[in-house]
Design a protein with these regions (language model features):
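Structural signature for solvent-exposed beta-strand/loop edge elements and short helix-capping sites
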Residues: 1-192
């Protein structure tokens, strides 16, 4: 950093100019960083990059807040999550993202084998389930899935199954020109 201020009485630091905070296998880089060692809080502004080399993921945004003690955190303004723990990187782009991964407004998730869009998304690492709300659409190898809510279950970052709830529709292009297979129901399970 080129400009920093530290208060040893309060254990608070402010770093200005392009700066980096390193904590074990995690780093936060940003144009301005604020660190409260007593409360174990970090906040970054401007082109923030949070990297966790142990879990092989990265978060990029313009505003980041993270509390190490509670695990609560959020990222706003052009948030982009990258999970490179598997051979194929998973990208999730959204306006805002929260620690349990709550992504809001204009969510896009993509990698080579699957793409998805929706208004809101919740990802739980406990059951490896990604739940998409409000006009969700999932594309996978020439197939399009639509519904009111879509639950995508993963196994080691590989899509295993999707549950489409409410006005479920699957559209798949046939080999022939302009012909499609279509299935519609109240609820549908799709296996990959």
């Amino acid at each position: 950093t080129t400009d920093a201020y530290t208060n040893s009485k309060t254990n608070m630091s402010q770093l200005f100019g392009r700066s980096t905070i390193v904590d074990g296998k995690k780093t936060i880089t940003g144009d301005s960083l604020f660190h409260n060692d007593k409360l174990k809080q970090n906040e970054g502004f401007g082109n923030v990059i949070y990297t966790d080399t142990e879990n092989k993921n990265e978060l990029r945004c313009d505003h980041l807040f993270y509390n190490e003690t509670t695990g609560y955190g959020y990222a706003t303004k052009r948030a982009l999550m990258l999970d490179y723990s598997q051979k194929d990187t998973l990208y999730v782009q959204t306006d805002s993202v929260y620690r349990k991964v709550h992504a809001f407004n204009h969510v896009r998730a993509y990698r080579d084998d699957v793409q998805a869009v929706c208004d809101s998304l919740v990802f739980s690492s406990q059951d490896s389930c990604m739940t998409m709300y409000r006009d969700p659409i999932v594309w996978n190898f020439g197939r399009q899935l639509l519904g009111e809510v879509i639950h995508v279950y993963m196994n080691d970052s590989t899509v295993r199954k999707a549950e489409i709830v409410g006005q479920a529709l699957s559209v798949e292009k046939c080999d022939e020109k302009n012909h499609f297979n279509q299935i519609s129901s109240k609820r549908m399970d799709a296996f990959f």
